[in-house]
Amino acid sequence: MQRVSELLSFLSAFRCDFFILPTPVTCPRYSVKAMKILQTLPLLVLFSSCQAHKDFFTSIGHMTDLLYTEKDLLTSLKDYIRAEELKLEQIKKWAEKFDSLSEMATNDPEGFLGHPVNAFKLMKRLNTEWLELENLVLKDMSDGFISNLTVQRQQFPTDEDQTGAAKALIRLQDTYNLDTETISKGNLPGVKHQPTLNAEDCFELGKIAYTEADYYHTELWMEQALQQLDAGEESSIDKVLVLDYLSYAVYQQGDLEKALKLTKRLLELDPEHQRGNGNLKYFEYIMTKEENKSSSSDSKDAEPKTKKGRPIDHLPERQKYEMLCRGEGIKMTPRRQKRLFCRYYDGNRNPTFILSPSKQEDEWDKPRIVRYHEIISDKEIEKVKELAKPRLRRATVHDPVTGQLTTAQYRVSKSAWLSGYEDPVIARINARIQELTGLDVSTAEELQVANYGMGGQYEPHFDFARASNTLGS
Protein backbone atom coordinates (compact mmCIF):
# COMPACT_ATOMS: atom_id res chain seq x y z
CA MET A 1 0.00 0.00 0.00
CA GLN A 2 2.89 2.35 0.81
CA ARG A 3 4.27 2.15 -2.72
CA VAL A 4 0.89 2.93 -4.25
CA SER A 5 0.41 5.79 -1.81
CA GLU A 6 3.67 7.38 -2.90
CA LEU A 7 2.66 7.20 -6.54
CA LEU A 8 -0.76 8.67 -5.90
CA SER A 9 0.65 11.51 -3.83
CA PHE A 10 2.84 12.57 -6.70
CA LEU A 11 0.17 12.20 -9.35
CA SER A 12 -2.29 14.21 -7.29
CA ALA A 13 -0.22 17.30 -8.12
CA PHE A 14 -0.84 16.70 -11.79
CA ARG A 15 -3.72 14.63 -13.08
CA CYS A 16 -5.82 12.81 -10.52
CA ASP A 17 -8.57 10.51 -11.70
CA PHE A 18 -9.48 9.48 -8.14
CA PHE A 19 -12.12 11.21 -6.03
CA ILE A 20 -11.55 13.10 -2.79
CA LEU A 21 -14.67 12.47 -0.76
CA PRO A 22 -16.09 13.38 2.64
CA THR A 23 -15.32 11.08 5.55
CA PRO A 24 -17.51 7.99 5.08
CA VAL A 25 -19.16 5.68 7.57
CA THR A 26 -16.38 3.49 8.96
CA CYS A 27 -17.05 -0.24 9.01
CA PRO A 28 -14.90 -3.18 10.17
CA ARG A 29 -11.69 -3.43 8.21
CA TYR A 30 -11.44 -6.27 5.72
CA SER A 31 -8.39 -7.79 4.04
CA VAL A 32 -7.08 -5.84 1.08
CA LYS A 33 -6.02 -9.18 -0.44
CA ALA A 34 -9.70 -9.98 -0.94
CA MET A 35 -10.02 -7.10 -3.37
CA LYS A 36 -9.78 -8.80 -6.73
CA ILE A 37 -10.48 -6.01 -9.18
CA LEU A 38 -9.08 -2.52 -9.06
CA GLN A 39 -10.91 0.05 -11.12
CA THR A 40 -10.44 3.79 -11.30
CA LEU A 41 -13.95 5.08 -11.98
CA PRO A 42 -13.65 7.77 -14.66
CA LEU A 43 -10.79 6.15 -16.50
CA LEU A 44 -10.60 2.52 -17.55
CA VAL A 45 -7.24 1.33 -18.79
CA LEU A 46 -7.90 -1.32 -21.38
CA PHE A 47 -5.70 -3.86 -23.09
CA SER A 48 -7.75 -5.19 -25.96
CA SER A 49 -7.44 -6.10 -29.61
CA CYS A 50 -9.02 -4.01 -32.29
CA GLN A 51 -9.04 -3.43 -36.00
CA ALA A 52 -5.78 -2.73 -37.71
CA HIS A 53 -4.79 0.92 -37.63
CA LYS A 54 -1.71 3.09 -37.86
CA ASP A 55 0.64 3.81 -34.95
CA PHE A 56 0.74 0.20 -33.75
CA PHE A 57 3.34 1.01 -31.11
CA THR A 58 0.88 3.25 -29.27
CA SER A 59 -1.53 0.40 -28.49
CA ILE A 60 -0.82 -3.05 -27.07
CA GLY A 61 -4.24 -4.07 -28.38
CA HIS A 62 -3.27 -3.27 -31.95
CA MET A 63 0.11 -4.93 -31.50
CA THR A 64 -1.59 -8.19 -30.48
CA ASP A 65 -3.35 -8.12 -33.86
CA LEU A 66 0.09 -8.17 -35.48
CA LEU A 67 0.86 -11.45 -33.71
CA TYR A 68 -2.10 -13.09 -35.44
CA THR A 69 -1.10 -11.51 -38.74
CA GLU A 70 2.36 -13.02 -38.40
CA LYS A 71 0.88 -16.39 -37.44
CA ASP A 72 -1.28 -16.38 -40.56
CA LEU A 73 1.73 -15.53 -42.71
CA LEU A 74 3.74 -18.32 -41.09
CA THR A 75 0.99 -20.82 -41.91
CA SER A 76 0.99 -19.59 -45.51
CA LEU A 77 4.79 -19.84 -45.64
CA LYS A 78 4.72 -23.44 -44.38
CA ASP A 79 2.15 -24.31 -47.06
CA TYR A 80 4.47 -22.82 -49.66
CA ILE A 81 7.44 -24.82 -48.32
CA ARG A 82 5.43 -28.06 -48.47
CA ALA A 83 4.39 -27.27 -52.05
CA GLU A 84 8.01 -26.63 -53.04
CA GLU A 85 9.15 -29.84 -51.34
CA LEU A 86 6.46 -31.83 -53.18
CA LYS A 87 7.54 -30.21 -56.43
CA LEU A 88 11.18 -31.14 -55.80
CA GLU A 89 10.19 -34.72 -54.97
CA GLN A 90 8.40 -34.98 -58.32
CA ILE A 91 11.41 -33.52 -60.14
CA LYS A 92 13.70 -36.00 -58.37
CA LYS A 93 11.54 -38.89 -59.56
CA TRP A 94 11.77 -37.60 -63.13
CA ALA A 95 15.54 -37.29 -62.78
CA GLU A 96 15.94 -40.82 -61.39
CA LYS A 97 13.79 -42.24 -64.20
CA PHE A 98 15.71 -40.43 -66.94
CA ASP A 99 19.06 -41.26 -65.32
CA SER A 100 18.46 -45.01 -65.36
CA LEU A 101 17.27 -44.95 -68.99
CA SER A 102 20.16 -42.72 -70.11
CA GLU A 103 22.73 -44.97 -68.41
CA MET A 104 21.35 -48.04 -70.13
CA ALA A 105 21.05 -46.36 -73.52
CA THR A 106 24.52 -44.81 -73.67
CA ASN A 107 26.23 -48.10 -72.82
CA ASP A 108 24.91 -49.66 -76.06
CA PRO A 109 23.21 -46.98 -78.16
CA GLU A 110 22.66 -49.08 -81.30
CA GLY A 111 21.47 -52.13 -79.42
CA PHE A 112 19.17 -49.98 -77.27
CA LEU A 113 17.58 -48.22 -80.23
CA GLY A 114 17.41 -51.51 -82.13
CA HIS A 115 14.38 -52.27 -80.06
CA PRO A 116 11.42 -50.39 -81.58
CA VAL A 117 9.81 -49.78 -78.18
CA ASN A 118 12.92 -47.98 -76.93
CA ALA A 119 13.03 -45.88 -80.09
CA PHE A 120 9.38 -44.93 -79.67
CA LYS A 121 9.81 -44.08 -75.99
CA LEU A 122 12.85 -41.91 -76.76
CA MET A 123 10.76 -39.87 -79.18
CA LYS A 124 7.95 -39.69 -76.63
CA ARG A 125 10.25 -38.60 -73.80
CA LEU A 126 11.90 -35.82 -75.74
CA ASN A 127 8.71 -34.61 -77.37
CA THR A 128 6.29 -34.95 -74.45
CA GLU A 129 7.77 -35.91 -71.10
CA TRP A 130 10.58 -33.37 -71.04
CA LEU A 131 7.99 -30.73 -71.89
CA GLU A 132 5.94 -31.85 -68.90
CA LEU A 133 9.05 -31.64 -66.74
CA GLU A 134 9.76 -28.16 -68.06
CA ASN A 135 6.26 -27.05 -67.11
CA LEU A 136 6.70 -28.54 -63.65
CA VAL A 137 10.01 -26.74 -63.12
CA LEU A 138 8.53 -23.45 -64.33
CA LYS A 139 5.45 -23.80 -62.14
CA ASP A 140 5.51 -21.06 -59.49
CA MET A 141 4.44 -22.51 -56.13
CA SER A 142 4.74 -19.14 -54.39
CA ASP A 143 1.61 -17.55 -55.86
CA GLY A 144 -0.57 -18.28 -52.81
CA PHE A 145 2.04 -17.11 -50.33
CA ILE A 146 2.86 -13.95 -52.29
CA SER A 147 -0.84 -13.08 -52.64
CA ASN A 148 -1.40 -13.47 -48.90
CA LEU A 149 1.75 -11.51 -48.10
CA THR A 150 0.66 -8.69 -50.41
CA VAL A 151 -2.70 -8.42 -48.66
CA GLN A 152 -1.23 -8.62 -45.16
CA ARG A 153 1.50 -6.11 -45.96
CA GLN A 154 -1.15 -3.40 -46.03
CA GLN A 155 -1.47 -3.87 -42.26
CA PHE A 156 2.26 -4.06 -41.51
CA PRO A 157 3.87 -1.60 -39.09
CA THR A 158 5.84 1.28 -40.56
CA ASP A 159 9.24 2.80 -39.86
CA GLU A 160 7.47 5.08 -37.38
CA ASP A 161 6.22 2.03 -35.48
CA GLN A 162 9.68 0.49 -35.35
CA THR A 163 11.17 3.78 -34.17
CA GLY A 164 8.41 4.18 -31.59
CA ALA A 165 9.02 0.68 -30.26
CA ALA A 166 12.76 1.35 -30.00
CA LYS A 167 12.18 4.63 -28.17
CA ALA A 168 9.83 2.85 -25.77
CA LEU A 169 12.49 0.27 -24.97
CA ILE A 170 15.05 3.00 -24.36
CA ARG A 171 12.55 4.89 -22.20
CA LEU A 172 12.01 1.79 -20.05
CA GLN A 173 15.79 1.39 -19.85
CA ASP A 174 16.14 4.89 -18.39
CA THR A 175 13.10 4.76 -16.14
CA TYR A 176 14.09 1.54 -14.41
CA ASN A 177 17.88 2.03 -14.58
CA LEU A 178 18.42 -1.10 -16.69
CA ASP A 179 21.76 -1.75 -18.37
CA THR A 180 21.93 -2.88 -21.98
CA GLU A 181 23.24 -6.35 -21.14
CA THR A 182 20.28 -7.04 -18.85
CA ILE A 183 17.83 -6.04 -21.59
CA SER A 184 19.78 -7.94 -24.23
CA LYS A 185 19.60 -11.15 -22.19
CA GLY A 186 15.90 -10.62 -21.48
CA ASN A 187 16.41 -10.60 -17.72
CA LEU A 188 13.74 -8.01 -17.00
CA PRO A 189 12.04 -8.07 -13.59
CA GLY A 190 8.45 -9.24 -13.42
CA VAL A 191 8.25 -10.70 -16.94
CA LYS A 192 7.12 -14.17 -17.97
CA HIS A 193 9.08 -14.53 -21.20
CA GLN A 194 12.79 -13.85 -21.71
CA PRO A 195 13.43 -12.98 -25.36
CA THR A 196 17.00 -11.97 -26.16
CA LEU A 197 18.43 -9.30 -28.44
CA ASN A 198 21.09 -10.31 -30.94
CA ALA A 199 23.88 -8.01 -32.08
CA GLU A 200 21.82 -6.81 -35.03
CA ASP A 201 18.94 -5.86 -32.71
CA CYS A 202 21.30 -3.92 -30.45
CA PHE A 203 22.80 -2.20 -33.48
CA GLU A 204 19.32 -1.22 -34.69
CA LEU A 205 18.48 0.33 -31.30
CA GLY A 206 21.72 2.27 -31.37
CA LYS A 207 21.10 3.39 -34.94
CA ILE A 208 17.62 4.72 -34.09
CA ALA A 209 19.09 6.63 -31.14
CA TYR A 210 21.74 7.96 -33.55
CA THR A 211 19.12 9.30 -35.96
CA GLU A 212 17.59 11.17 -33.01
CA ALA A 213 21.03 12.67 -32.18
CA ASP A 214 20.85 10.76 -28.89
CA TYR A 215 24.52 9.85 -28.73
CA TYR A 216 24.34 8.71 -25.12
CA HIS A 217 22.09 5.77 -25.95
CA THR A 218 23.85 5.28 -29.29
CA GLU A 219 27.05 4.56 -27.39
CA LEU A 220 25.32 2.20 -24.93
CA TRP A 221 23.71 0.04 -27.59
CA MET A 222 26.61 0.08 -30.06
CA GLU A 223 28.90 -1.06 -27.25
CA GLN A 224 26.49 -3.89 -26.47
CA ALA A 225 26.42 -4.91 -30.13
CA LEU A 226 30.22 -4.83 -30.25
CA GLN A 227 30.47 -6.84 -27.04
CA GLN A 228 28.27 -9.59 -28.48
CA LEU A 229 30.23 -9.63 -31.74
CA ASP A 230 33.50 -9.86 -29.80
CA ALA A 231 32.03 -12.84 -27.94
CA GLY A 232 31.73 -14.67 -31.26
CA GLU A 233 28.08 -14.15 -32.10
CA GLU A 234 27.32 -14.62 -35.79
CA SER A 235 25.57 -11.64 -37.31
CA SER A 236 24.75 -9.92 -40.59
CA ILE A 237 26.48 -6.77 -39.33
CA ASP A 238 30.22 -6.47 -38.90
CA LYS A 239 32.42 -4.81 -36.31
CA VAL A 240 33.56 -2.12 -38.74
CA LEU A 241 30.04 -0.76 -39.12
CA VAL A 242 29.43 -0.82 -35.36
CA LEU A 243 32.76 0.87 -34.62
CA ASP A 244 31.99 3.56 -37.19
CA TYR A 245 28.81 4.57 -35.35
CA LEU A 246 30.30 4.03 -31.90
CA SER A 247 33.41 6.17 -32.43
CA TYR A 248 31.35 9.09 -33.69
CA ALA A 249 28.84 8.82 -30.83
CA VAL A 250 31.68 8.82 -28.31
CA TYR A 251 33.28 11.82 -30.01
CA GLN A 252 29.99 13.74 -29.88
CA GLN A 253 29.96 13.21 -26.12
CA GLY A 254 33.38 14.76 -25.70
CA ASP A 255 35.50 11.64 -25.10
CA LEU A 256 38.07 12.31 -27.82
CA GLU A 257 40.62 9.84 -26.48
CA LYS A 258 38.17 6.93 -26.58
CA ALA A 259 36.92 7.98 -30.01
CA LEU A 260 40.50 7.90 -31.31
CA LYS A 261 41.07 4.46 -29.79
CA LEU A 262 37.90 3.08 -31.40
CA THR A 263 38.81 4.60 -34.76
CA LYS A 264 42.24 2.94 -34.67
CA ARG A 265 40.56 -0.39 -33.96
CA LEU A 266 38.24 0.19 -36.92
CA LEU A 267 41.22 0.81 -39.21
CA GLU A 268 42.92 -2.35 -37.99
CA LEU A 269 39.94 -4.25 -39.36
CA ASP A 270 39.55 -2.14 -42.51
CA PRO A 271 42.66 -0.03 -43.30
CA GLU A 272 41.00 1.43 -46.42
CA HIS A 273 37.94 2.76 -44.59
CA GLN A 274 37.59 6.27 -45.99
CA ARG A 275 35.64 7.89 -43.15
CA GLY A 276 37.75 6.13 -40.55
CA ASN A 277 40.97 7.50 -42.03
CA GLY A 278 39.48 10.97 -42.20
CA ASN A 279 38.29 10.80 -38.60
CA LEU A 280 41.68 9.53 -37.43
CA LYS A 281 43.45 12.57 -38.88
CA TYR A 282 40.83 14.92 -37.48
CA PHE A 283 40.87 13.40 -33.98
CA GLU A 284 44.68 13.46 -33.86
CA TYR A 285 44.66 17.08 -34.98
CA ILE A 286 42.15 18.09 -32.30
CA MET A 287 44.05 16.19 -29.59
CA THR A 288 47.34 17.81 -30.58
CA LYS A 289 45.68 21.21 -30.56
CA GLU A 290 44.21 20.63 -27.09
CA GLU A 291 47.52 19.32 -25.73
CA ASN A 292 49.35 22.41 -26.98
CA LYS A 293 46.68 24.63 -25.49
CA SER A 294 46.80 22.90 -22.11
CA SER A 295 50.61 22.95 -21.97
CA SER A 296 50.74 26.69 -22.70
CA SER A 297 48.19 27.54 -20.00
CA ASP A 298 48.38 27.16 -16.24
CA SER A 299 47.45 23.59 -15.22
CA LYS A 300 45.47 25.00 -12.29
CA ASP A 301 43.17 26.81 -14.68
CA ALA A 302 42.51 23.71 -16.76
CA GLU A 303 38.93 22.52 -16.44
CA PRO A 304 38.42 18.78 -15.91
CA LYS A 305 36.88 17.03 -18.88
CA THR A 306 33.40 15.77 -18.19
CA LYS A 307 31.71 13.29 -20.45
CA LYS A 308 28.17 14.06 -21.47
CA GLY A 309 25.56 11.83 -19.89
CA ARG A 310 21.92 11.16 -20.51
CA PRO A 311 20.20 13.91 -22.52
CA ILE A 312 18.64 16.65 -20.40
CA ASP A 313 14.87 16.32 -20.27
CA HIS A 314 12.44 19.22 -20.53
CA LEU A 315 10.27 17.86 -17.72
CA PRO A 316 11.40 19.27 -14.34
CA GLU A 317 9.64 16.46 -12.48
CA ARG A 318 11.35 13.73 -14.55
CA GLN A 319 13.53 12.44 -11.71
CA LYS A 320 10.63 12.14 -9.24
CA TYR A 321 8.43 10.65 -11.94
CA GLU A 322 10.91 7.86 -12.67
CA MET A 323 11.65 7.26 -8.99
CA LEU A 324 7.95 6.66 -8.35
CA CYS A 325 7.79 4.24 -11.28
CA ARG A 326 10.58 2.28 -9.58
CA GLY A 327 8.73 2.29 -6.25
CA GLU A 328 10.99 4.91 -4.75
CA GLY A 329 10.25 8.47 -3.70
CA ILE A 330 8.23 10.07 -0.95
CA LYS A 331 7.91 7.94 2.16
CA MET A 332 4.94 8.17 4.48
CA THR A 333 5.75 8.08 8.20
CA PRO A 334 4.42 5.15 10.28
CA ARG A 335 2.21 7.58 12.17
CA ARG A 336 0.54 8.72 8.96
CA GLN A 337 0.27 5.15 7.70
CA LYS A 338 -1.72 4.19 10.78
CA ARG A 339 -4.38 6.66 9.73
CA LEU A 340 -5.04 4.83 6.48
CA PHE A 341 -7.87 2.30 6.57
CA CYS A 342 -9.96 0.01 4.40
CA ARG A 343 -13.71 0.22 4.93
CA TYR A 344 -17.15 -0.42 3.51
CA TYR A 345 -18.70 2.77 2.16
CA ASP A 346 -22.44 3.31 1.72
CA GLY A 347 -22.26 6.45 -0.43
CA ASN A 348 -23.50 8.69 2.39
CA ARG A 349 -26.51 6.46 3.05
CA ASN A 350 -27.30 6.03 -0.63
CA PRO A 351 -29.98 3.29 -0.96
CA THR A 352 -27.95 1.53 -3.65
CA PHE A 353 -25.02 0.96 -1.29
CA ILE A 354 -26.73 0.44 2.07
CA LEU A 355 -27.27 -3.30 1.55
CA SER A 356 -24.23 -3.72 -0.69
CA PRO A 357 -21.60 -1.16 0.32
CA SER A 358 -18.58 -0.48 -1.83
CA LYS A 359 -15.03 -1.35 -0.80
CA GLN A 360 -12.97 1.75 -0.13
CA GLU A 361 -9.26 2.05 0.65
CA ASP A 362 -7.35 5.11 1.86
CA GLU A 363 -4.31 5.76 -0.31
CA TRP A 364 -3.12 9.14 0.94
CA ASP A 365 -4.03 11.54 3.73
CA LYS A 366 -3.18 15.04 2.48
CA PRO A 367 -4.67 15.52 -0.02
CA ARG A 368 -7.11 12.76 0.77
CA ILE A 369 -7.13 10.10 -1.95
CA VAL A 370 -9.23 6.95 -1.82
CA ARG A 371 -9.45 3.91 -4.05
CA TYR A 372 -12.62 1.92 -4.78
CA HIS A 373 -12.49 -1.82 -5.43
CA GLU A 374 -14.82 -4.13 -7.35
CA ILE A 375 -16.96 -1.30 -8.67
CA ILE A 376 -17.29 -2.84 -12.13
CA SER A 377 -17.81 -6.55 -12.80
CA ASP A 378 -15.72 -8.64 -15.19
CA LYS A 379 -18.72 -8.99 -17.49
CA GLU A 380 -19.17 -5.22 -17.61
CA ILE A 381 -15.48 -4.74 -18.29
CA GLU A 382 -15.63 -7.11 -21.26
CA LYS A 383 -18.63 -5.24 -22.63
CA VAL A 384 -16.81 -1.92 -22.32
CA LYS A 385 -13.83 -3.41 -24.16
CA GLU A 386 -16.10 -4.76 -26.87
CA LEU A 387 -17.70 -1.35 -27.41
CA ALA A 388 -14.39 0.52 -27.35
CA LYS A 389 -12.46 -1.91 -29.57
CA PRO A 390 -13.38 -0.48 -33.00
CA ARG A 391 -13.04 3.13 -31.83
CA LEU A 392 -9.54 3.23 -30.40
CA ARG A 393 -7.61 6.09 -31.97
CA ARG A 394 -4.29 7.74 -31.18
CA ALA A 395 -4.70 9.84 -28.03
CA THR A 396 -4.22 13.58 -28.46
CA VAL A 397 -3.14 16.54 -26.36
CA HIS A 398 -4.07 20.21 -26.53
CA ASP A 399 -1.58 22.37 -28.42
CA PRO A 400 -1.38 25.67 -26.48
CA VAL A 401 -0.10 27.52 -29.55
CA THR A 402 -2.66 26.47 -32.16
CA GLY A 403 -5.48 25.56 -29.78
CA GLN A 404 -5.93 22.31 -31.72
CA LEU A 405 -5.78 18.69 -30.59
CA THR A 406 -2.65 16.95 -31.79
CA THR A 407 -0.66 13.78 -31.12
CA ALA A 408 2.42 13.96 -28.90
CA GLN A 409 5.43 11.71 -28.44
CA TYR A 410 4.97 11.76 -24.67
CA ARG A 411 1.45 10.29 -24.88
CA VAL A 412 1.81 6.76 -26.19
CA SER A 413 -1.75 5.43 -26.12
CA LYS A 414 -5.05 5.16 -27.96
CA SER A 415 -8.41 6.22 -26.60
CA ALA A 416 -12.12 5.77 -27.17
CA TRP A 417 -15.11 7.57 -25.65
CA LEU A 418 -18.39 5.88 -24.72
CA SER A 419 -21.73 7.55 -23.99
CA GLY A 420 -24.44 6.25 -21.68
CA TYR A 421 -27.08 6.19 -24.43
CA GLU A 422 -25.02 3.73 -26.49
CA ASP A 423 -25.48 0.74 -24.21
CA PRO A 424 -27.24 -0.04 -20.91
CA VAL A 425 -23.92 -1.17 -19.40
CA ILE A 426 -22.38 2.29 -19.88
CA ALA A 427 -25.51 3.90 -18.47
CA ARG A 428 -25.32 1.66 -15.38
CA ILE A 429 -21.65 2.48 -14.84
CA ASN A 430 -22.36 6.20 -15.11
CA ALA A 431 -25.24 5.90 -12.65
CA ARG A 432 -23.03 3.96 -10.23
CA ILE A 433 -20.35 6.65 -10.39
CA GLN A 434 -22.94 9.33 -9.73
CA GLU A 435 -24.47 7.51 -6.76
CA LEU A 436 -21.08 6.69 -5.23
CA THR A 437 -19.57 10.17 -5.55
CA GLY A 438 -22.61 12.39 -5.31
CA LEU A 439 -21.49 14.16 -8.48
CA ASP A 440 -23.71 14.81 -11.50
CA VAL A 441 -22.21 12.87 -14.42
CA SER A 442 -24.44 14.66 -16.94
CA THR A 443 -21.94 17.53 -16.89
CA ALA A 444 -18.90 15.26 -17.00
CA GLU A 445 -16.94 13.82 -19.91
CA GLU A 446 -17.96 10.58 -21.57
CA LEU A 447 -16.45 7.36 -20.25
CA GLN A 448 -12.87 7.17 -21.53
CA VAL A 449 -11.22 3.89 -22.42
CA ALA A 450 -7.43 4.05 -22.84
CA ASN A 451 -5.16 1.40 -24.29
CA TYR A 452 -1.48 2.12 -23.71
CA GLY A 453 1.23 0.97 -26.06
CA MET A 454 4.76 -0.34 -25.65
CA GLY A 455 6.42 1.40 -22.73
CA GLY A 456 3.01 3.03 -22.20
CA GLN A 457 3.69 6.65 -21.39
CA TYR A 458 1.72 9.70 -20.37
CA GLU A 459 3.97 12.15 -18.61
CA PRO A 460 2.84 14.09 -15.52
CA HIS A 461 0.70 17.04 -16.54
CA PHE A 462 -2.00 19.39 -15.37
CA ASP A 463 -5.54 19.21 -16.71
CA PHE A 464 -5.71 22.97 -16.70
CA ALA A 465 -3.73 25.70 -18.40
CA ARG A 466 -1.11 27.61 -16.45
CA ALA A 467 -0.32 31.31 -16.81
CA SER A 468 2.80 30.46 -18.80
CA ASN A 469 0.84 28.12 -21.06
CA THR A 470 -2.45 29.85 -21.84
CA LEU A 471 -4.98 28.04 -24.00
CA GLY A 472 -5.06 29.36 -27.53
CA SER A 473 -2.14 31.72 -27.01
Where are these regions (language model features)?
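Classical eukaryotic N-terminal signal peptides for Sec-dependent ER targeting/secretion
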Residues: 1-44, 236-238
